[in-house]
Amino acid sequence: MNEPQSLKAATVQFQHQANNKKYNLLIMEKFIEQAAHEQVKILTFPEMCITGYWHVPKLTAAEVSALAEPLAESPSLTLIRSLAIKHQMLIGAGLIERADDGRLYNAYVACMPDGSMHTHRKL
């Protein structure tokens, strides 16, 4: 009979800075490195943690659009994806997505250890 294998999962809650993707990604990277050190294989971050969440309803359409990133060329997801590959960890994170048709979405992306990405769009 096969021995059961364990899988370590963790979730992170942190105080993001509104409109400050650089800061938020720096904090996220620190949590990812800590999780890797602790041999975590699945790590989830909050909804819209890259861009910030609570301030968005107060922004103008132009300000929200400026925060959005197309997923395929997203600098934020390029970093998260590279860390997922490096640490062989599934990392989930949220941001404002700009779709190919220009529409904006509250998206949650799972960056997989093999480099693939899977997206859920909140309506």
Language model features with spans:
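Basic/polar N-terminal segments that are highly enriched at the extreme N-terminus
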Residues: M1-Q5
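Active-site-proximal beta-strand elements of phosphoester/diester hydrolases
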Residues: S6-Q17, A107, T119-K122
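Alpha-helical structural elements
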Residues: A9, L26, M48-C49
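N-terminal phosphate-binding loop and adjacent alpha-helix
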Residues: Q13-F31
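Cys-nucleophile CN-hydrolase/nitrilase-fold catalytic domain and related Cys-dependent amidase chemistry
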Residues: K21, E33-P113, H118-T119
